[in-house]
From Swiss-Prot:
SUPFAM superfamilies, sorted: Nucleotidylyl transferase
Keyword terms: ATP-binding, Coenzyme A biosynthesis, Cytoplasm, Magnesium, Nucleotide-binding, Nucleotidyltransferase, Transferase
Family under the similarity heading: Belongs to the bacterial CoaD family.
Reaction(s) catalysed (UniProt annotation): (R)-4'-phosphopantetheine + ATP + H(+) = 3'-dephospho-CoA + diphosphate
InterPro entries for the chain: Cyt_trans-like, PPAT, Rossmann-like_a/b/a_fold
Cofactor(s) needed by this chain: Mg(2+)
Species: Syntrophomonas wolfei subsp. wolfei (strain DSM 2245B / Goettingen)
NCBIfam families: coaD_prev_kdtB, cyt_tran_rel
Main subcellular localisation: cytoplasm
Protein name per the record: Phosphopantetheine adenylyltransferase
Length: 161
């Protein structure tokens, strides 16, 4: 079985992330969306909230499941016996950063490859940071994120903003 891991903070998950999952789910038998718990980053959504939002946003993808982890990605990949890391690319800037990360991961875990998937052109400008900023300033992010995420952002803005 070909198992791949799509790691990220996903704060929040965007339509760009879902696009990458839809593409990669056609290639791998199973994909784990590995939500990173990074104590050095201040997240808008809690780890549990991010996991739930991704689960709800990927219900249509039968071979995708969601998990949370902290620590070194290499250790997580070895534990899950993954064969690949999934990464999405929007622009050349993404490629440069992701290539460095792929090389580092290859050094740490030589038997695992990084697979790059190009974002659909309609998603190249979407980032979680931009979505959060737009939502915080009252922008309509409905075309940028799954409906459940839009609702979650609106709730956050009402309760926290």
């Amino acid at each position: 079985m070909k198992l791949a891991v799509y790691p990220g903070s996903f704060d929040p998950v965007t339509n760009g992330h879902i696009d990458i999952l839809e593409k990669s789910s056609k290639i791998f038998d199973e994909i784990i969306v590995a939500v990173i718990h990074n104590v050095t980053k201040k997240a808008l959504f809690s780890l549990d909230e991010r996991v739930k939002l991704i689960e709800e946003s990927t219900r249509h993808l039968n071979n995708v499941r969601v998990d949370a982890f902290s620590g070194l990605l290499a250790n997580y990949l070895a534990d899950k016996q993954a064969c690949a890391i999934i990464r999405g690319l929007r622009t050349v800037t993404d490629f440069e950063y992701e290539m460095h990360m792929a090389m580092m991961n290859k050094k740490l875990i030589p038997n695992i490859d990084t697979m790059f998937f190009m974002s659909d052109s309609q998603y190249t400008f979407i980032s979680s940071s931009a979505v959060k900023e737009a939502a915080l300033l009252g922008g309509d992010v409905g075309s940028l994120v799954p409906a459940v995420v839009k609702a979650g952002l609106e709730e956050k803005m009402l309760n926290d903003g």
